[in-house]
Swiss-Prot record:
<dbReference type="InterPro" id="IPR036388">
    <property type="entry name" value="WH-like_DNA-bd_sf"/>
</dbReference>
<keyword id="KW-1133">Transmembrane helix</keyword>
<dbReference type="Pfam" id="PF01022">
    <property type="entry name" value="HTH_5"/>
</dbReference>
<dbReference type="GO" id="GO:0006355">
    <property type="term" value="P:regulation of DNA-templated transcription"/>
</dbReference>
<dbReference type="GO" id="GO:0003700">
    <property type="term" value="F:DNA-binding transcription factor activity"/>
</dbReference>
<feature type="transmembrane region" description="Helical">
    <location>
        <begin position="76"/>
        <end position="96"/>
    </location>
</feature>
<keyword id="KW-0472">Membrane</keyword>
<dbReference type="InterPro" id="IPR001845">
    <property type="entry name" value="HTH_ArsR_DNA-bd_dom"/>
</dbReference>
<dbReference type="InterPro" id="IPR011991">
    <property type="entry name" value="ArsR-like_HTH"/>
</dbReference>
<feature type="domain" description="HTH arsR-type">
    <location>
        <begin position="1"/>
        <end position="85"/>
    </location>
</feature>
<keyword id="KW-0238">DNA-binding</keyword>
<dbReference type="GO" id="GO:0005886">
    <property type="term" value="C:plasma membrane"/>
</dbReference>
<keyword id="KW-1003">Cell membrane</keyword>
<keyword id="KW-0812">Transmembrane</keyword>
<dbReference type="InterPro" id="IPR051081">
    <property type="entry name" value="HTH_MetalResp_TranReg"/>
</dbReference>
<dbReference type="GO" id="GO:0003677">
    <property type="term" value="F:DNA binding"/>
</dbReference>
<feature type="transmembrane region" description="Helical">
    <location>
        <begin position="132"/>
        <end position="152"/>
    </location>
</feature>
Length: 157
């Protein structure tokens, strides 16, 4: 999945989807150094997304069927990865919100004790007891499993 976060690798895949290229040709077209293009091509080759064809002194790179499938489904993959990051962001927000509520509860209970008011404070915000937490946990778990499954299916095609 590392290739998704590299604009150069995506550009290389798009170019190789048009026709086969050498490192020099890709370097000129994309405006990158030959060593940079070579690094990206080697990474794509290791992932099985491109293949090499040797013709005497020239080495041409071509996109594989797996590379074509990934390129075709690139938008879906980006959407899935974005969804995972959105879920992570929501979880972080939710956890910090709970920490804030628990800190407030501690301050309130301390104030009640200091003032000598002997009423029972029932405002527990422990997030394990909240139905919202359980619903959020279940939905997030299913979404993450579904997203991982879809990514796996797309890459394995």
């Amino acid at each position: 999945m590392k290739f998704l976060f590299s604009k150069t690798k995506i550009e290389i895949l798009k170019k190789l989807n048009e026709r086969n290229y050498t490192i020099s040709e890709l370097s000129k077209i994309l405006g990158k150094s030959k060593s940079t293009i070579s690094e990206h091509l080697n990474a794509l080759y290791e992932m099985g997304l491109v293949d090499k064809e040797n013709y005497s002194k020239w080495v041409y790179y071509k996109i594989t069927n797996k590379g074509k499938k990934v390129l075709e489904n690139l938008e879906a993959l980006i959407l899935m990865v974005s969804s995972i990051f959105a879920l992570i962001g929501l979880w972080i927000y939710y956890i910090f919100k709970q920490i804030k509520y628990q800190a407030r509860e501690v301050v309130l209970s301390k104030t009640v004790v200091e003032r000598g008011i002997y009423t029972t404070y029932k405002g527990s915000t422990t997030f394990q007891k909240e139905p919202l937490f359980l619903i959020f946990l279940i939905i997030s778990t299913f979404l993450i499993i579904f997203i991982v499954y879809l990514v796996y299916k797309i890459i394995r095609r």
